[in-house]
């Protein structure tokens, strides 16, 4: 294992422990990845407990989502990671989490997007410099056909190049960043904002 792969794998392992510890990636849910080079990514192996990841729980894939390591099966949702790397060369890490807040809020919001507005913490997202604007988070209906789901995600990405993440209804959050630390920051920001939105909804009833 070369130094770069070892470092990126350790970042994925550390991310898993952190996200599991916060309750955002329970049991074997969720999947994480990091760009290895121009044509490859490292992803978590399917079905592994995210709070107990080791070096054997990460594998390399090409950007079509195909495993490059015989005997290791990538997550069924690998294509949702690799499409992001293919879409933007600036993306270096992708995190998919299954928190209670993201799951419940995605079911409560009517329509195809969540609009975050007037929150100071919006500035935690890459490229956002003020609380005064809107951050639109698209919500896609869950689909076991991942290629079909990716086909619905792609037009949104193309039309919204500053998009910081998206929700899958009743499922969870996808977010990303130039580095793993950036992606983790965005997960934290989303979770705070999702909790705020849920409290607003509960108090307004």
Swiss-Prot record:
The gene is mtnB. Zn(2+) binds at residues 96, 98. Belongs to the aldolase class II family. MtnB subfamily. It comes from the Bacteria. Its EC number is 4.2.1.109. One of its GO terms (molecular function) is methylthioribulose 1-phosphate dehydratase activity. Catalyzes the dehydration of methylthioribulose-1-phosphate (MTRu-1-P) into 2,3-diketo-5-methylthiopentyl-1-phosphate (DK-MTP-1-P). Binds 1 zinc ion per subunit. The lineage of its organism: Bacteria, Pseudomonadati, Pseudomonadota, Gammaproteobacteria, Pseudomonadales. This is Methylthioribulose-1-phosphate dehydratase. GO terms for cellular component: cytoplasm. Keywords: Amino-acid biosynthesis, Lyase, Metal-binding, Methionine biosynthesis, Zinc. It catalyses: 5-(methylsulfanyl)-D-ribulose 1-phosphate = 5-methylsulfanyl-2,3-dioxopentyl phosphate + H2O. HAMAP family: Salvage_MtnB. Its cofactor is Zn(2+). Disulfide bonds: none annotated.
